[in-house]
Structure formats: C-alpha cells, structure tokens
C-alpha cells in the first residue's frame, strides 16, 4: 500500500494537520505536514491514542432492550370484540467470554498459591523441627561439658578419694551419653513425622484442586459444545425458568387440578372451556390456549445437503441453507469478498461458502440432461479409414467452382446467380484412387462466417489462386482460416493457360503470408491447374489423396451418427431442409436427430444430386428433411435414442439462447442510453430481409450491419429463410421498412398487402447489387453538407456619402462577379470585420444585378457605414453538397 502524507491523513480522519503532528510527537514520532506516514507508524499512533484514552479496555458487558407492541382482539360484553395493545419488553445482557475465562484463571492461580503456601509451611515445619533437635543436642553437650568440668574440679580438691570413685563416674557418663542419644533420636523422629504429615496434607490438597479443575473444565466444554449455548444467558434462563414455575404454581393454586391429575394448559378452565370473563373471573384476561411455544432450538448444528447449480444468487443460497442472507454476506466478508444480496455467485464460490458454514454440497449442471443424451451412444470403437473432406477456398472469381465443376463433370458455376457461389456446396467425388468429399465455399467478402465453417469441418484446404491476379484479400483470409484450424494447405494455381499467367509471382506473394512452396523448402504443395483445359487436375487429386494418406483419417463407421450442418434452408414444399456432413457413424432414415436448437426424425434423405438414399456414412454430405425448424449453419447434428429427451434438450437450448439474447439487448440498451441522448436522433433504415438459405442470410445481415454509421443505422427488424409472406409485408408497412428478398419471392397474399400499403419491395440474386443499393439508400438519408464558394472580390478605391444610403464604396471588381442577391463579407487586412448583404449595386448611376471582373461599381452595404479605402468586399454563395457513404 502506498504511504500517505501527514496532511492527507489528517484530511481523511477529519483533524487539523497541526494537531496530528502534535499527536505524532507525543507518541515519540517526529513528523512534519509533508512527511509520509507508513502503516507501522499509523499503528504505533493508534496504540498510543488507545492507551491515552483508555481504548484498550473494551466494554465487557452489553445490555439490549427490545420493545414490541402487538394487538390482541378480545371479546367484550354483548358479543362485541375490541382490540387492546400488548407491549412486550425484553432485556438481554451479553458478557464477553473473556470475563469467564479470567475468573477461571483467577481461581486456578488462587489454588496454585494455596498449594505453594502449603508446601512452604511443610518446609518451614521441617526446618523448625531440625533446629529444635539441634538446639537440644547442643544444650546436652554443654551440660556434659559442665559436668566434666565440675568433676575435674572436685577431683583436684579431693585428690585420692576421687581416684576411688572413677568406676562409678565412668558408668554415669555412659548412661548420660545413652540418654542423650535416645533424646536426639526421638526429636529427629518427631520432626520427620511432622514433615511427612505436612507433605501428605499438601499432596491431598493438590489432588483435590486438580480434580475440581478437571470437573470445571469438563463442564465448560460440555456447555460450549451444546448448540446455541451462551455464557451470558444461562443465568437468565435459569431465573426465567424459576419465575415461570412460580407463576404456574400460583395459577395452579387458584384453578385446582382435575381428578385425573392431568395438568391443564394455562388459560383453560375445568372441562376444557375457555375463560369467558364471567362473575368469578371478571377481571381475568382471555389467555391463549397454551403459553408454550411450538418451536424448540435444535440441540446441535443442522447439516443440510445444499444443491448448487452453475450460478446462484446470495438470496437463493441463503434460502437453500435456511439461514439469513446477512450470514452469507458476513461469511464472504471474512473470506475477503464484498457481495450484495442479489449478486450472482459462480458454482465454486458458492461451494466454498456452503462448506465453510458446515453444509454438504451437491453440485448440479443445468444441462445435465443434454450431457446424458449426448453421452448415451453406442460403445462401438472400431474405426475404419474414411474419405478426406476437402474445402476449396480462395478469392472471388478465381475459379474455385469451375475447378470443382471440371472435377464433377457438371455445370455448377453457370447455375449460380452472377456466376459466383453464394452457398456452401457439398459434393463427393469417386476417383480411381478413392473417394473425396469437396466443400465449395463463397469467395465474396460477405461470406467470412461460411468460410470459417468450411475450414472447421474440413481435413484439407485447397487454396485456389488465379495466376493472372495473384494474392487478394479473401486469399489471405482463407490462409488465416486454415492456420487457425490447423489444416494442411494445398495451393492450386489456376488459370495457368492464360498468356498473362505468372505462377512465380503467386509463389512470391504467398511466401509473404507464411505459405512456402516445397520447391523453396516449405511444406505446402503447389499444383498448376487449369479449370478450362483440365491441365493439372489429376496431379491435384493425387496430391489431395497423398496428403490424406499422411493424415491417416479414420472414423467409426457403424453406430449412431454425428456430423455438422453445412447449410440449411426453408423449402416451401418440403419444410426445413438441412445439409449435413456426416463425420462419424451412419445416418439412417428414421433416426432421431438433435441439431442445435432444433430436433426431429429423419423423414427423407437425399444426396447432392437430389437422389433419395436411406443411409450415409462418414464424410458423406446429405440433405435431411423432418426437423422442427431451420438449424443454424455450423450447428452440430447428433443422433439420439429418445425423441422426448431430444425435444427437452432443444427447448432448453432455445430458452438459454433467448435469455442470452435478451440479456445482450438489455446491456446494449443500457450502454447506449446516454450516447443516444447526447447524439440526438439517428436516421434508421428499416429492412425486412428474407433469403433462400441460412448461410446467405447470415452473410447479408452481417454486411448490412457493417454499413451502419453514426448518422444512419441499418435496422434489420425481421429476417428469415424462405419466401416473403403476408406477415412480413404487414410488418414492413407498420415499421416503414424496405422488403428485401434474396433469391426468394413474395406469395400472392403478400403481393396484395405490398400493393395496398405501397411497401418498397426489392428482389436480388447477387449480393453485390443488394449491398450497393442499400448503401445508396443510406446515402440519400444522410444530412447534406453546405459549402461556401467565393464568387467575386471587389477592392474599395474611394468612399462617397449618400444622403439616402450612407457610405457608398467605389470599388473595382478584381475577381469573379459581384451579385446583388448574394451575401458579402467586408475584409480589412484580410480579417473579416463585417458579414451581411448588399443594399445597393450601381454602375454609372444605374442599378444593376451583377458587375463582372475588371469593371467599376458603387456598393452600398446594408447597416454598415465604416467602409474605408483599401477594404475588400467578398461576395459568396452557399452550395449544398449531397453526401455519400
């Protein structure tokens, strides 16, 4: 964390900087206003202030008082009921657990002090006994010494008689020594016995204290483990219990028990009737049947199995765990995350919170059924070689379809409108060396998504480049798609038979984009072909099969099929039609197919030539009928076992798609709200668009949306696959939209509505023309630009005074023509000093409309008299310029 200055800290805490500097100095930290303050210094200052103001001693006891007022309806006289207010007051005291711990620590310290005092008393008693025995021994020794001294003196006095008594003295000395030893032994034994008794007493006291402490610790732990036990409320609970018992006893004395001894609920009279406030109980209130509440606190924490989906809000999670949302918010704050009650949590976060709060978590996926349906497939793992899927890509008009046409020996290019491909064509071709499946993609810039789908579903990309045209934008885009898909690239240099063909230039240009020829040490095969003469076609097919052999392409042939939607359309007679490229398994007539947001039973199957077939294996393109709607191109098609489950999955996907779409629209509205308010009104060109196939519809919609500018916006209010219907015409009339049909026509009912409502209907078969005309229509909606053009310039040579007009400038026209009706500017030293209009234009006293270059004239400027010699009068006109996109 970055350090802050003293002045900034003072501003944050709401103090003056001088006072904060004083407090720092009192805390032993020297600071000025401009010095920075670290976190440690802040902490040191805080501790100093706490000590100074007594902040360390936090309150150990807190009392909460709660008052609630409710209304109770009671019956009065005459059968009428009246409402009375009941006020309930509650008082609850909370004591810090630390107080109880401190009391326990004090008791323990007291017991330890007692044990220590007992041990010290025992040691003192032992020392006293030993000192007493020692003193007695010393006294005996002194007495002995004294007796010996007296005996010696007596002996010296008596002389000879003393010698006779020597035997008696010796016997007396021995007896005295024996008695002294016995007395010392007795004193020592007594001291040992007293010390032993004191030690035994101290040990017994220590054992008793140990037992008492252990019992107190056990009781404390039991009380802590019990659910919802609170140290502060146990005393109050016991007091409340005693009070309740006393009240019950008092009421029991008034209302005697029945003969059976069964305790009646409080508020019930004998016989089970309610007290109605008669003569005997006039002053009694109507009590409820029982004062006992029906809920008891659980004795232990309740552990629940919490089911958590992919996302869950805080409120929903709290409801599942049966706790208040604030508890979850507190828990997440402890975990370092700030959330609100309506915030959406992901599955992992919700799992952590629930487990932290002691619950078991069961994770679920909303699309569990989808996973089950897709996983319920045949377990056949036997793989066999399959034909390669080859996508032909390249720039528009470089000869992709003509090349494929030569291979198929059919006229496809001439059948496409404008000679350009506008759909993905899927064909399979039998050659001498094996089968190859071709996907022909459009080259026009609008069909980016189509080309991307073609690269995704393919094994090999053949990049067609015209030898006379070289590398173009869609050629580069095709290279990028191939690299993104990790697909090997074969370059077919087409139109090699033309005189202006330059294959070396093509190689050089492609090498700049990372496509190197094998001749130049690269990995890409270059084949020179001609779609017109057939030159190099066999070499191209051999190269494709060789590349496929290197890739070792294999797939499961038997079992449930899976593939990808290449193209889809709505046929008037057959309904939704989808072209599917089978990637594994065998697709059979009658199979249940789940295809993106749609599902259905395969009613009929046709190959690319329109012939009916009953099954299709891997790498075979096939048209299927029977789906519930038109799937999007690029969707995965999967055969499933159960039609009911397929319907459920499709409906779930549709709901999810709708939710995402609505959320995106809402987000867009919120983001653009203020922009729309500030920018003002934006012109909108409303379009109702219908196309023959899904891919073309997608490409046209994308291209038209890209035409939108800040001033004119293309708004496609409705789009779809199939012919123009009466509903489309009504919608276009209501929203003032243009109806656009791409390779489709309006039916009879739609044509009537179009004529009666005067709706603008346009048909197109080439995407170029459609985009150009929409662009022109948008250009017509743009606000025009205005430009000022200078048409004449006159120099003031002299100034005359006119009584009617005022100052008249005698001028010479130096450039262009001075027109009387045009606005003018007066320039002085090339600076505009006035802008207005002419009041009079004369030549030789005659009023004229214009004066040409090189002639003299008199000019009167309306509402301006400060014309001076040397000024220039500039005449201009405003020209409107039509804008284009």
Swiss-Prot record:
**G5 as annotated region, ranges:** 530-532
Residue stretches of biased makeup (Basic residues): 251-260
Renumbered to this chain, region (Disordered) spans 99-295
Q: Where in the cell is it found?
A: Cytoplasm
Q: Where is this region: G2?
A: 419-423
Q: Which UniProt keywords apply?
A: Cytoplasm, GTP-binding, Initiation factor, Nucleotide-binding, Protein biosynthesis
Enumerate the residue ranges of region (G4). 494-497
The UniProt record lists the tr-type G domain at 385-554
Q: Which NCBIfam families match?
A: IF-2, small_GTP
Family statement? Belongs to the TRAFAC class translation factor GTPase superfamily. Classic translation factor GTPase family. IF-2 subfamily.
**What name does the UniProt record give this protein?**
Translation initiation factor IF-2
Per the UniProt record, the source organism is Shewanella loihica (strain ATCC BAA-1088 / PV-4)
Q: Which gene encodes it?
A: infB
């Amino acid at each position: 964390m970055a350090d802050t200055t003293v002045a900034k800290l003072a501003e944050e805490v709401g103090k003056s900087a001088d006072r904060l500097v004083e407090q720092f100095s009192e805390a032993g930290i020297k600071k000025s206003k401009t010095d920075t303050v670290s976190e440690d210094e802040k902490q040191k200052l805080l501790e100093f202030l706490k000590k100074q103001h007594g902040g360390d001693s936090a309150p150990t006891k807190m009392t909460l008082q709660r008052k609630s007022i409710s209304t109770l309806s009671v019956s009065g006289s005459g059968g009428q009921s009246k409402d009375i207010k009941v006020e309930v007051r509650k008082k609850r005291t909370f004591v810090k657990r630390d107080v109880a711990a401190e009391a326990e620590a004090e008791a323990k310290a007291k017991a330890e002090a007692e044990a220590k005092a007992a041990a010290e008393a025992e040691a003192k008693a032992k020392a006293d006994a030993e000192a007493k025995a020692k003193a007695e021994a010393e006294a005996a020794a002194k007495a002995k010494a004294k007796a010996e001294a007296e005996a010696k003196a007596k002996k010296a006095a008596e002389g000879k008689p003393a010698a006779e008594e020597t035997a008696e003295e010796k016997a007396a000395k021995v007896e005295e020594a024996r008695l002294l030893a016995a007395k010392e032994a007795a004193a020592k034994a007594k001291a040992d016995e007293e010390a032993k008794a004191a030690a035994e007493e101290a040990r017994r006291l220590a054992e008793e204290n140990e037992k008492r402490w252990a019992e107190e610790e056990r009781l404390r732990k039991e009380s802590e483990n019990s659910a919802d036990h609170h140290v502060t409320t146990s005393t109050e609970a016991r007091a409340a219990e005693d009070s309740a018992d006393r009240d019950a006893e008092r009421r029991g004395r008034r209302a005697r028990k029945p003969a059976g001894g069964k305790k009646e609920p409080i508020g019930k009279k004998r016989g089970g009737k309610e007290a109605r406030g008669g003569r005997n109980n006039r002053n009694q209130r109507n009590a409820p049947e029982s004062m006992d509440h029906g809920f008891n606190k659980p004795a232990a924490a309740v552990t629940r199995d919490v089911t958590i989906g992919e996302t869950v809000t805080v409120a929903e999670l709290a409801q599942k765990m049966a706790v208040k949302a604030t508890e979850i918010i507190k828990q997440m704050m402890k975990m370092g995350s700030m959330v609100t009650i309506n915030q959406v949590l992901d599955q992992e976060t919700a799992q952590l919170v629930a487990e932290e709060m002691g619950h078991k978590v069961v994770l679920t996926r909303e699309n569990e059924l989808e996973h089950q349906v897709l996983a319920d497939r045949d377990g056949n793992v036997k793989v066999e070689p399959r034909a390669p899927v080859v996508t032909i890509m390249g720039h528009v008009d470089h000869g992709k379809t003509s090349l494929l046409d030569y291979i198929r020996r059919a006229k496809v290019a001439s059948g496409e409108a404008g000679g350009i491909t506008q759909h993905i064509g899927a064909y399979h071709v039998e050659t001498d060396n094996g089968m190859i499946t071709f996907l022909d993609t459009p080259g026009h810039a609008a069909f980016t998504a189509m080309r991307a789908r073609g690269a995704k579903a393919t094994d090999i990309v053949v990049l067609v480049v015209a030898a006379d045209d070289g590398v173009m934008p869609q050629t580069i885009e095709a290279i990028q798609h191939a690299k993104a898909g990790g697909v090997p690239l074969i370059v077919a240099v087409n139109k090699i038979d033309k005189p202006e063909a330059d294959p070396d230039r093509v190689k050089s240009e492609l090498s700049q984009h990372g496509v190197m020829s094998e001749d130049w040490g690269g990995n890409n095969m270059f084949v020179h072909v001609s779609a017109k003469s057939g030159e190099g076609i066999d070499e191209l097919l051999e190269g494709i099969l060789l590349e496929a052999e290197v890739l070792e392409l294999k797939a499961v042939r038997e079992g449930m099929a899976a593939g990808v939607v290449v193209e889809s359309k709505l046929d008037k007679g057959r309904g939704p039609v989808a072209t599917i490229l089978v990637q594994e398994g065998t697709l059979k007539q009658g199979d249940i197919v789940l295809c993106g947001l749609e599902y259905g039973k395969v009613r009929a199957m046709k190959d690319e030539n329109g012939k009916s077939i009953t099954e299709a294996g891997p790498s075979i393109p096939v048209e299927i009928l029977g789906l519930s709607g038109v799937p999007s191109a690029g969707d995965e098609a999967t055969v499933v076992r159960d039609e009911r489950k397929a319907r459920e999955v499709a409906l779930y996907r549709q709901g999810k798609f709708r939710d995402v779409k609505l959320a995106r629209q809402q987000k867009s509205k919120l983001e653009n709200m203020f922009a729309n308010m500030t920018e003002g009104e934006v012109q909108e060109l409303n379009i109702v668009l219908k196309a023959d196939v899904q891919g073309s519809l997608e490409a046209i919609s994308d291209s038209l949306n890209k035409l939108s500018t800040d001033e004119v916006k293309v708004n496609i209010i409705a789009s779809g696959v199939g012919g123009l219907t009466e509903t489309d015409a009504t919608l276009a009339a209501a929203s003032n939209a243009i109806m656009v049909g791409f390779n489709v026509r309006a039916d009879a009912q739609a044509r009537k509505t179009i004529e009666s409502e005067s709706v603008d209907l346009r048909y197109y078969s080439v995407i170029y023309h459609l985009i150009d005309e929409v662009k022109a229509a948008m250009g017509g909606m743009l606000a025009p630009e205005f430009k000022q053009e200078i048409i004449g310039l006159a120099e003031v040579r002299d100034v005359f005074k006119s009584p009617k007009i005022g100052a008249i400038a005698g001028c010479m026209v130096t450039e262009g023509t001075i027109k009387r009706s045009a606005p003018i500017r007066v320039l002085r030293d090339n600076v505009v000093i006035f802008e207005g209009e002419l009041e009079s234009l004369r030549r030789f006293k005659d009023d004229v409309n214009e004066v040409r270059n090189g002639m003299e004239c008199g000019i009167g400027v309306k509402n301006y008299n400060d014309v001076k010699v040397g000024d220039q009068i500039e005449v201009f006109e405003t020209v409107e310029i039509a804008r284009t996109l």
